[in-house]
A protein has these predicted regions:
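Beta-propeller folds
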Residues: 7-10, 20-492, 498-501, 507-513, ...
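Serine-hydrolase catalytic core recognition
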Residues: 47, 275, 345-346, 354, ...
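General helical structural elements
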Residues: 6-7, 619
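N-terminal signal peptide c-region/cleavage motif recognized by signal peptidases
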Residues: 14-17
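Positively charged n-region of N-terminal signal peptides that target proteins for export
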Residues: 1-4
């Protein structure tokens, strides 16, 4: 009998040991953000278009170093801008520091006059820090100390036609216009703020301040006199009471008329918008309080007042734009051209002409949106286009064509995002695009050919509906044609100013990123393919795409599965669902990215990690799909996520349906906590980061838009707004699994109060859980992301694999990174 008991006890020990799977921290450690950064280089081209032609240049880095290319689309050529070996030798001879072709850091590389490059190179030579020393000496209130030193910066010009390198270090350096100056299109004057009012000065005085910021001869011409800290001129909405130095010149948001005679500006009344706070406990020398304006759902909002200034006499008048209580307005800005980037200052010009401009007006519940025209000779605005929906109206900036006589308007009025042609007077002329697909935006317009170029998803029903493609179509709605490659997602697109050519960066999560040049008819010239050779050499493998059904059994959902790179199909693995509920985007990406810490890298610990969409998630499908969660913002996506996991477990034997985890950040933090509380017998572990668990205290814009707010008009005619929503803390008593809550303590996006309220409810429900507060970190966790990763790895390893490194005080992987 004794012998039998010993045998049984030994068998139990063996069984317990077999049930635990050792987490593979070493494999995950190989793919830290820092290490991946040394294996993956350029993944997309950012074309820098020439000012006066369709040429462009770009930078491209691989494991062989960095090269710079000039592309001539007309001549169909791609040439290297520099002979890097020769350039490195010439720079070394001047700077007196050794460089080679693979190690030549060019700083501030810019094209000037389409004929030469300018750039800087930092040397190891220490020189006196002239500007700083001069300022300190000018103060005169401190004894002169040792001259401050800095590394010398050499400045160069490289002449394209001759390949000649010119050292211009000793030449007087061109100074940039100050950031506070909103300069008129004709370059004669600048508008800015001091304190809470608006001022202007001549451009000559601006230039004086560029030479000496204490020049006493400059004149500040004051335009307004009634600004206060909560009712101020020309700032951004919600800036509120953060201006402490009322003598300092600061930027304001004004938009000029094309002829520089007038400008429009909004004055924001923030007196009823309440403050919110965070305390930075690790600030030195003592903790600091940050106060900022933060409107929560149902609370009073800012009131926008639109003014038009006439620079001939400095007069202003208010434009009557009132239509809805707590409405939101935006004066539209002229679309920037590539050539504008070469100007000495960024031109802030309104969308319209010298006689008037256009703006958007939205009701607070976002069910009504107007495109307005404001004529400078009048005191009120005219409705051009009026949109209504029972959920909420979204818009895109219109494109004016035919000399401003017509406009291209984006609308979801028929359940899909489509393009419409309107007359400038508001007459609907025709629907341009027509079909069960989503038009994301207008990319370019060729007015001479009367062709619109746009990006759309879901046109080809045989493709993943999230794949974005470039199309062309005539103003009359005919001749629609796809221009880029099928089967990929064009996620970054740049057109030449004349709309004759475009560069597309395209990929999928399971393919290497590529870049190509196309002309307006779709003729393709390949440019680059990302160099992932070092990543693959380290063992990297692409994730696997999949398609499942939503819980309704009808709607298709799309996702990706991330496996350990040492995956063994004979084993079983826990599954972790990385989630973001939407509604502005879903957790699953459609383009390859090096930022895969919470998916690919997490899988290396020993998990199957998935991302999958859910009804109510992504806006790039139908309006029905996007608005599915309207009015049910806490729970709308949970059932689909659970059902997707169940389908995958039935499809793949290596998934252990009894070991399910869930993880998310921000909206995903909110969703992952809701999931483990709503389905406590299904989800066994969750890590929820920076979650907006209580959307009644999250920002009004996101919460009211995606959940809805009730607008009521009383018998006396007053308008009130009521907001009610289910919160995670309401169901804290349901917790059975293992929940880890994480927040930065100075998160001024999603207040830490969201997490604290869930913590409070869990404590009062007598629940065990984990809480991690990251000191001095905002919404994205900053330089503590790597620390967070290993704490997350510990949590899932402990509760899904059965063992972890939580018993080790030192995180060795962090010490070795």
């Amino acid at each position: 009998m004794k012998r039998l008991l010993i045998f049984c006890f030994a068998a139990l020990l063996c069984s317990a040991g077999a049930s635990a799977q050792e987490p593979n921290y070493a494999l995950a450690d190989q793919f830290s953000a820092k290490k991946v950064g040394n294996m993956v280089f350029s993944t997309a081209i950012r074309p820098n278009w020439f000012k006066n032609s369709d040429k462009f240049w770009y930078e491209w880095k691989t494991s062989e170093g960095t090269e710079y290319y000039i592309v001539d689309p007309v001549a169909k050529t791609q040439t290297k801008a520099f002979d890097m070996e020769r350039l490195a030798m010439e720079v070394s001879a001047i700077v007196k520091d050794p460089f080679d072709a693979k190690h030549l850091p060019l700083r501030k590389l810019e094209l000037k006059d389409d004929s030469k490059f300018t750039f800087e190179v930092q040397s190891t030579e220490m020189v006196e820090k002239k500007d700083k020393q001069k300022k300190d000496d000018d103060k005169g209130d401190k004894p002169k100390g040792k001259p401050q030193k800095e590394k010398k910066i050499y400045r160069f010009e490289y002449i394209l036609a001759t390949g000649k390198l010119v050292d211009v270090t000793e030449n007087e350096e061109e100074k940039d216009y100050p950031m506070w100056a909103c300069i008129s299109p004709d370059g004669s004057k600048a508008v800015y703020s001091k304190g809470f009012d608006i001022y202007w000065m001549t451009i000559d005085d601006v230039k004086k301040l560029m030479e000496d910021e204490k020049d006493s001869t400059v004149v500040d011409h004051r335009l307004t006199f009634d600004g206060t800290k909560d009712f101020y001129w020309g700032g951004s909405n919600y800036r509120g009471a953060d201006t402490k130095d009322t003598t300092k010149r600061t930027a304001n948001y004004v938009l000029w008329s094309p002829d520089s005679k007038r400008f429009a500006v909004t004055k924001y009344d923030m007196t009823k918008v309440k403050d919110l706070w965070v305390i930075n406990s690790v600030a030195q020398p003592r903790p600091t309080l940050q106060t900022y304006k933060y409107q929560m759902p149902g609370e009073p909002g800012p009131v926008d007042h639109l003014f038009l200034f006439d620079m001939a006499d400095g007069s202003c008048k208010e434009i009557n734009i009132a239509a809805y209580k707590d409405q939101d307005t935006d004066v539209l800005r002229r679309t920037m051209k590539n050539a504008d980037r070469y100007d000495d200052w960024r031109k802030s010009v309104w969308m319209g002409d010298n006689d008037g401009f256009y703006m958007i007006r939205r009701s607070r519940d976002l069910k009504r949106t107007d495109l307005l025209r404001v004529n400078v000779a009048e005191d009120s605005a005219h409705i051009v286009v009026h949109e209504t929906l029972n959920t909420y109206v979204e818009t895109r900036s219109p494109r004016f064509v035919n000399g401003g006589k017509d406009l291209i308007w984006w609308s979801e009025r028929n359940g899909w995002a489509q393009l419409y042609l309107y007359g400038a007077d508001g007459t609907l002329k025709r629907q341009i695009t027509d079909g069960a697909f989503h038009v994301e935006n207008v990319l370019a317009v060729d007015e001479a050919a009367k062709v619109i170029y746009f990006q759309a998803m879901g046109v080809d029903k045989n493709e993943n509906p999230y794949n974005g493609h470039v199309y062309r179509i005539g103003f009359d709605g005919t001749g629609i044609k796809q221009l880029d490659d099928p089967g990929f997602n064009s996620n970054s697109i740049s057109f030449s100013d004349d709309a004759k050519f475009f560069v597309s960066n395209f990929s999928r999560v399971d393919s290497t990123p590529q870049s190509a040049l196309y002309d307006g008819t779709g003729r393709k010239t390949p440019l680059q393919e990302a160099d992932l050779s070092l990543l693959f050499a380290a063992g990297y493998k692409f994730p696997t795409p999949f398609k499942v059904k939503a819980a309704d059994g009808v709607t298709d959902l799309y996702g990706y599965m991330y496996k350990p790179f040492d995956f063994d199909s004979t084993k079983t693995y826990p599954i972790i669902d990385y989630v973001y509920p939407g509604p502005q985007v879903e957790g699953n990406s459609e383009a390859w990215s090096r930022g895969f810490t919470r998916t690919d890298r997490l899988a290396q610990i020993g998990f199957i990690v998935i991302t999958v969409g859910n009804r109510g998630g992504h806006p790039n499908r139908s309006k029905w799909y996007h608005n599915f969660g309207y009015g049910n913002l806490r729970d709308y996506g949970l059932e689909d996520q659970k059902y997707a996991i169940q389908q995958l477990a039935a499809r793949y034997k290596f998934i252990d349906i009894d070991r399910v985890g869930i993880h998310g950040h921000s909206g995903g933090g909110f969703m992952s906590t809701a999931a483990i509380l709503e389905y406590p017998d299904f989800f066994k572990a969750a890590v929820s980061c920076a979650g907006n668990h209580d959307n009644s205290i999250y920002n009004r814009w996101w919460s009211e838009q995606h959940h809805g707010i009730l607008e009521e008009i009383t018998a006396s005619g007053d308008t009130t707004f009521k907001y009610s929503i289910d919160k995670n803390q309401d169901i804290a008593g349901n917790l059975k699994g293992h929940l880890m809550l994480v927040t930065g303590d100075i998160d001024d996006n999603v207040s830490p109060s969201n997490t604290i309220r869930v913590v409070n409810a869990l404590i009062r429900a007598n629940k065990r859980f984990e809480m991690l507060v990251l000191p001095g970190q905002r919404h994205g966790f900053g330089d503590m992301n790597e620390y967070f990763f290993w704490r997350m790895a510990d949590w899932y390893s402990e509760w899904l694999l059965g063992t972890s490194h939580r018993d080790q005080v030192d995180i060795r992987e962090l010490n070795n990174d």
